[in-house]
Amino acid sequence: MKIRRCFPPLLALCIVLAPRYAQSQNQNVNNGSPVYVQQEGFVDANGVMIYYRILGRGEPLLIVHGGPGASHDYFLPYLLPLARHHKLVFIDERGSGRSQKLEDASGYTVENMVEDVEAVRVALRLGQVTLLGHSYGGALAQAYALKYQKNLSHLILGSTWSSTKALNEVFIRMKQNMSPELQQRIHNLESSGLFGHGKDYEKNRYTTEYMVAAWGEGYFPYLYQNRPDPNYDPVDNGKMSWELYREMWGEHGEFVVDGNLRSVEYTDRLSTIKVPTLILVGDHDECDPSLAEAMHQKIAESKLVVFPKAGHMTFVDQPEMFRKAVESFLMK
């Protein structure tokens, strides 16, 4: 194939004009344009490649996801309206989503993830940030605040917990509220061990039967209330980092946390958090409102919002209430 060469004068003109054109385009995007440019990449954080995704304008709002072992994807498209006034910085925690997975699962700890969040903040030159954590991400956000609150302007804790002991008590009550038939079915599956069953490709995750029983019949009333996601599939929910999940959550099912997340006992230390804090929870949340109330009582500069007709996915059940709660809090 014949390749045509650029004429040198034309090439020189292209080189001169390209940066100016790009700069002009960026200015247009940043000055009231309806176009929102997305940026993504990786930060080498303590030897682990952490994926980040940036979208929006304004002060940085750093967002950490739950699971543990999920990814930032479940926030979208629901948090997109916040990008109009805030620079949203999503990350996938180590071992999750697009971030690097570890050969040694013992490296999956809250403490290590705190250092990853800090490394991302420093590498991206974000300065002081608002940190928003949902579910497990809320526990991670608390751990970060307990060590690095000088780097926070605000803290937002969504559908989370500060005491794993208290969370396990919530799960006991959740099980007791199930039908006797479902309780027995889940008990039988958990008693026989949740891993190592089925086909070779199934042995390192929950069986389909358990996913349906636990994440479908068991959890669903606590995930959604007002706007149940018609695309929710408990089996699809199993697409996550299983080695991480087993290390952190544990191996004995959805209704007891007995992995290294047992270390999450922060309640008595929360009084040291002095940054303005917003605590969000659904009235039918998997992380019961009593857990949010316990955090609210300990953090002096906190505001508690309980969303009506909302489960764990508050920003899905009550998207406008969620947006207004976050934006009004950050305006103060």
Predicted regions and their residues:
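Conserved alpha/beta-hydrolase catalytic His-Asp/Glu region
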Residues: 193-252, 260, 269
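Flexible "cap/lid" loop of the alpha/beta hydrolase fold
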Residues: 156-200
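Catalytic active-site module of serine/aspartate enzymes centered on a nucleophile-bearing elbow/loop
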Residues: 302-332
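Conserved hydrolase catalytic core segment
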Residues: 127-173
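Conserved HGGG/HGGXW glycine-rich cap/lid loop of the alpha/beta-hydrolase fold
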Residues: 48-101
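Short beta-strand/loop motif that positions the catalytic acidic residue
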Residues: 273, 279-281
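Active-site loop/oxyanion-hole signature of alpha/beta-hydrolase fold enzymes
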Residues: 93-136
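Conserved alpha/beta-hydrolase "acid-adjacent" motif
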Residues: 286-291
